[in-house]
Amino acid sequence: MSELILKCEGVGKRYRDGGLDVLVLHGLDLEIRAGESTGIIGSSGSGKSTLLHILGGLDMPSEGRVLLMGEDLRTLNQRRLGDLRNRHLGFVYQFHHLLPEFSALENVMMPLLIGKKSREEAAEAAMAMLEKVGLKHRSTHRAGELSGGERQRAAIARALVTQPKCLLADEPTGNLDRANARNVLDMMLELKTELGTGLVVVTHDDELAGRFERVMVMKDGSLHPKQGANA
């Protein structure tokens, strides 16, 4: 069995909205392993993105716990949490969040520079990752000079350049047309296999979700395997 990266145990999340106590997630159990792909689908407002934020340590559960590489995220100080997250997790969102004043290469270098790599090391690793996503020839172009699909490829390269254990993606193809969405997903799945990275993707697109090894449905704050899905 492949390495266990993330584990949710009885995870729940509540928010206060005025005088109301709103239950968003309850009783969630989930394991994410290296090299496995998981799609999470559900209606808008069902809690998909909230779960992804909790998996990534960007938010904490109201009950239960999340283990990242065996460490309970609730027990960590902010410095240790940030270090663990930066070392083991990559994030991709619907909007690419590339810095417009920098080239594709410089954007992909950024996580490595933040991690104290030298510019030479960062540039070499970033260029290698841009080559993997088919953007080596566009490395000197700024975000505004790239197409929508190219910008999302650059964002994925940036998320993977630190070689994280798991990539968490929130609607990564949501701003793309159908052809580009398929191409980007193909690339993510290929890199998942090549790098042995766990992949968790939140999407509203049932067709794209069907490409993953496991599909989970978020409904009424609970997570269930999709009937008839692979897994």
UniProtKB/Swiss-Prot annotation:
Domain ABC transporter positions: 6-231
Q: What is its main location?
A: membrane
Keyword Cell inner membrane, does the record have it?
A: yes
State the membrane topology.
Peripheral membrane protein
Give an example GO cellular component term for this record. plasma membrane
Q: Does the keyword Cell membrane apply?
A: yes
Transmembrane region(s): none
Task: Give the E.C. number(s).
Answer: 7.6.2.-
Compartments reported by the entry:
Cell inner membrane
The record lists ATP as bound by: 42-49
Output the GO biological process annotations, alphabetical, semicolon-separated: lipoprotein localization to outer membrane; protein localization to outer membrane
Keywords, ordered alphabetically: ATP-binding, Cell inner membrane, Cell membrane, Membrane, Nucleotide-binding, Translocase, Transport
Q: Which domain of life is it from?
A: Bacteria
InterPro entries under this entry?
A: AAA+_ATPase, ABC_transporter-like_ATP-bd, ABC_transporter-like_CS, ABC_transpr_LolD-like, LolD_lipo_ATP-bd, MacB-like_ATP-bd, P-loop_NTPase
Q: What function is annotated for this protein?
A: Part of the ABC transporter complex LolCDE involved in the translocation of mature outer membrane-directed lipoproteins, from the inner membrane to the periplasmic chaperone, LolA. Responsible for the formation of the LolA-lipoprotein complex in an ATP-dependent manner.
Q: Which PANTHER family match?
A: IMPORT ATP-BINDING PROTEIN, LIPOPROTEIN-RELEASING SYSTEM ATP-BINDING PROTEIN LOLD
The record's comment on protein family reads: Belongs to the ABC transporter superfamily. Lipoprotein translocase (TC 3.A.1.125) family.
Name of this protein: Lipoprotein-releasing system ATP-binding protein LolD
Give the organism, scientific name. Answer: Neisseria meningitidis serogroup A / serotype 4A (strain DSM 15465 / Z2491)
